[in-house]
A protein has these predicted regions:
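Short, Lys/Arg-enriched N-terminal segments with co-localized hydrophobic residues
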Residues: 1-9
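Helix-start/capping segments and mature chain N-termini
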Residues: 10-132, 160-245
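Charged, gly/pro-rich active-site loop segments
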Residues: 132-143
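Intrinsically disordered, low-complexity linker/loop segments enriched in Gly/Pro
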Residues: 135, 155-157
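Extended, Lys/Arg-enriched charged tracts that mediate electrostatic binding to polyanionic substrates
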Residues: 141-151, 155
Length: 245
């Protein structure tokens, strides 16, 4: 019962005007939708909004492309970055559906607060999300297992290597067409030495560094023929906490 929350287009009071820079030509014909590799193909548009001088401003939807950012940006040095992940689906009638998008929005702000990142305005988030879904609607394919992966994220962009919270940030949304992540049975192993989080840490936040720390033990598990890890508590490794996806 995933399709319980139909997106309500144009339902947000537009207190903030989002500028749209349109593409010259879609890249959709370059993508093989029958053989997608998760997270490698991206739609025509992306959203970005910058935090400067104490407020979020200049929300823009633009063609997907590279960023220009200082090598001294604090995201590179202190890992001030959080993200979310959710999916949009299209039914056989062409309607687009989301599953509890407000929960994902609330969680990215909760994660941001834990990493001293300013919260993002709800009305801008949903206006941007709705507008992008309309622009990229052809990238959402109907049928079992097909979806559009939605990746909102925030990074610290202030230039400087002092160990302190950034004063500037960039909030972005990317779309990536997706199919089922696993095509068959999934083999898991229970972690006996490594932990995903510790008491008082940032385990409850979707912080970028949490995932980087999982890569090494997950690679060890894959070398042994497993797909993912069941994480245990950090004190005794006796109690199950969560599974990787």
């Amino acid at each position: 019962l995933l399709f319980t929350a139909k997106i309500k287009f144009m339902s947000i009071i537009k207190n903030h005007s989002i500028s749209v820079k349109h593409i010259e030509k879609s890249r959709i014909d370059e993508v093989d939708f029958n053989h997608l590799i998760f997270g490698e193909d991206f739609t025509d548009y992306m959203f970005e909004c910058d935090f400067r001088n104490g407020s979020w401003g200049n929300p823009t939807i633009k063609p997907f492309g590279n960023l220009s950012i200082s090598p001294a940006a604090k995201v590179f040095h202190y890992g001030q970055a959080v993200f979310e992940g959710m999916k949009a689906y299209k039914d056989e009638q062409g309607k687009i559906w989301l599953f509890r998008p407000e929960d994902n929005f609330n969680r990215i702000n909760k994660s941001s607060k834990r990493l001293a990142i300013p919260e993002f305005p709800k009305e801008i988030f949903f206006e941007a999300l709705e507008s992008m879904l309309l622009l990229d609607k052809d990238w959402i394919k109907p049928g079992f297992g097909n979806s559009l992966y939605i990746r909102p994220f925030v990074i610290a962009t202030e230039s400087g290597v002092s160990a302190s919270p950034s004063s500037e940030y960039k909030f972005m949304i990317l779309f990536s067409p997706a199919q089922a992540y696993y095509s068959g049975d999934v083999k898991v192993v229970i972690a006996e030495h490594f932990s995903r989080s510790a008491d008082g840490g940032v385990g409850a936040a979707k912080a970028a560094g949490n995932y980087a720390a999982q890569f090494y033990p997950t690679n060890l598990a894959k070398e042994q023929g497993f797909h993912q890890v069941i994480w245990t508590d950090s004190n005794e490794h006796k109690y199950l906490e969560e599974a990787g996806t």
